[in-house]
Structure formats: C-alpha cells, structure tokens
Amino acid sequence: MASAVLSSVLTTASRFALLQVDSGSGSDSEPGKGKGRNNGKSQTLGNKSTANEKKREKRRKKKEQQQSEANELRNLAFKKIPQKSSHSVCNVQHELSLPNPVQKESREENWQEWRQRDEQLTSEMFEADLEKALLLSKLEYEEHRQDYENAENASTQTKVINKKDKRKNHQGKDKPLTVSLKDFQCEDHISKKTEESNSSQPLSHDGGFFNRLEDDVHKILVREKRREQLTEHNGTDNCPAPEHNQEVGLKDGRIERLKLELERKDAEIQKLKAVVTQWEAKYKEVKARNGQLLKMLQEGEMKDKAEILLQVDESQSIKNELTVQVSSLHAALEQERSKVKVLQAELAKYQGGRKGKRNCEPDQCR
C-alpha cells in the first residue's frame, strides 16, 4: 500500500509541476509578443489546471478513504498498531491530505488495547516464572530434607549444650550467647527452604500475591542484617574458651547421639535375628514336608507308569496273536477259493461231455 501511495503521489506532483512551468514560462520568456494571445493561452491553461487539480483532489480523497478503510480492516483483523513505512511517506501524506479524526480515534483505541494486553502478558509471565522458581526450590528441599533435619537436630543439641556451658562458665555475668557461623548458616538455609516450600503452594493471581512477595523480601533483608551483625560479633569476640567449650559440647552431644543410635540399632538387630531363626525353623519344616510329598508323587507316578507299560505289553501280544490268526485264516480262505475254482472247472467239463453224448444218440437213431 505504501509503495502504491508513493508512486501515485510522485506522478501527480510531477504533472502538476510541469503544468506550473508551462503556465509561467509563456508570460516570462516572450515579453515582446502580443498580449492578447498570452492572455488567452494563460486562461485556457488555468482552466485546464483547475480542472486537473479538481480531478486529482477527487482521486486523492478516494485513495485516502480506501487507505483508511484498509488500515481499519487490518487493525480489526490483526489488532496491531499501524506502522509508518518511512519518514518521507509520512511527510508526503501530511502535505497532501489532512488527518482523519476517525482514524486517530481508532489508532488511540488500538494503542490502549495493545498496552493493556502487553501489561497483562508481562504480569502473567512474571507470575509464571515465580511459580516455577518456587516449585524448583520445593523440589530441591524435598531432595535434601534428611540433611536439613539432621542439621536442625544437631543445631538444637548444640544450642542446649552451649547454654549449659555458658551457665557453668559465666555464672553471674549477663553476656549474650554467641552462635557459631556454621550453625547460623544452617539455620538460615533451613528457614529459607521452609519458607520457599510454604510459598510454593498454589498461588492466586491477585494483589495478595504481590503483598506476600514484599513480605518475603523484607524478611530476607532482615535476615541478611542479622547475619552481618553475627559475623561482626564473632569477629570481635577474641575469647577462645567458649569456642573450645562449644567444640567439646558438640563432640559430647554427637557421641551421646551416636551411642543412642547404636543401642537402638542393636535392639533392632536382635529382633531381626529372632525373626530370622523362626523363619529358618519354619523353612526346614516346609522343606521336609515338600520332600515327603515329592517321594509320594514319584512313587505314585512310577506305579502308574508300570501299570500302563504292562497294559501296553498285553495289548501288543494280543495284537500279534490276532494278526497271526488273521494271516492263517486268509491263507485257508485262498486255499478254499482255489479248490472251488478247480471244482467249478471239472463241473463245467463234465457237463460239456454229457451234452455231447446226448446229441450223438439221436443222430444214430435217425
């Protein structure tokens, strides 16, 4: 569309410029000729130029209307802000045509819609990223939960032991209890993970979500300040006796905890051994029963097999006897057949000889 507008604008401007040069050149270049002719020509040229200007204005208005309609349709279809092709095209359009108030209003409305959509998309993307980060932190906490629980138990035991040592060593002195940097970092890490796991629950897309985020940021800042204060306090504290007592207390607490765990595991081992012995006795009983059943089944199978084999032998012997009898009967039958054939032949000869004798006797009588 922009290229078509440029081509049309350039062609109309060039024609108009040529007409202006023709109209002005006749009056300036030939001052010595007749004024009547010049006046007539200038009038005819002026009339033609006005008619051409009117036609061009009509064409421009039609093109502007078509372009505005096309822009409105494009904005409605794609909901985008109309982009300007180049600075020269904008200047030419501004010089040729005045801005349309309807087009301005549509552009402002489209800009407001685009800005609202952009804000909504950015807020949704930000909330989705936060939810993903919280879910990842929750998964990490679930993976390392046992380590964190062990660290919490160790830190609580160390706190109790440190309090007892402080009471013993510093009776009558009101000094603040010092916590080691490692214990504090462990506690801080655990508290962070618990907060992240609590905040990783399904979030509602409302103002309360951002308020919770602000509260979490405030808590993190307070925690960082406390950490800095404790690091400064541990750096300025130069008495090695409490640290030694803390180390001894930590070792004693660990030893006691390990002893308790060993006793508990020994009791579990004894219980498991008793269970294993019971199952071994049951296994032996079941094995003996299975052996007896196997023997019985094998004996029964052998008996059945022996009976079947005997029956097979008997049937085979009977079959052989029957085959022998059938063969003998077949031979006797063949012999009888041969005898019958011989007798039939003799009978036929005898009957033929008798007929011949009867025929000869009447001939002799004649």
Curated annotation (Swiss-Prot):
Q: Enumerate the residue ranges of region (Disordered).
A: 20-105
Q: Looking at the record's lineage, which domain of life comes first?
A: Eukaryota
Q: Where is this region: Interaction with IRS1?
A: 1-95
Keyword tags: Coiled coil, Golgi apparatus, Phosphoprotein
Q: Which residues carry this modification: Phosphoserine?
A: 23, 25, 27, 106
Cysteine pairings via disulfide bonds: none
Compositional bias (Polar residues): 39-50
Please cite one Gene Ontology biological process associated with this protein.
Answer: positive regulation of insulin receptor signaling pathway
Where in the cell?
Golgi apparatus
Recall the GO molecular function terms of this protein's record. Answer: identical protein binding
Q: Name one GO cellular component term.
A: Golgi apparatus
What positions belong to coiled-coil segments? 46-77, 129-160, 250-299, 326-353
State the protein's purpose: Regulates insulin-dependent IRS1 tyrosine phosphorylation in adipocytes by modulating the availability of IRS1 to IR tyrosine kinase. Its association with IRS1 is required for insulin-induced translocation of SLC2A4 to the cell membrane. Involved in TNF-induced impairment of insulin-dependent IRS1 tyrosine phosphorylation.
Subunit-structure text: Interacts with PRKG1 and IRS1.
Homology family: Belongs to the GKAP1 family.
> Can you name this protein?
G kinase-anchoring protein 1
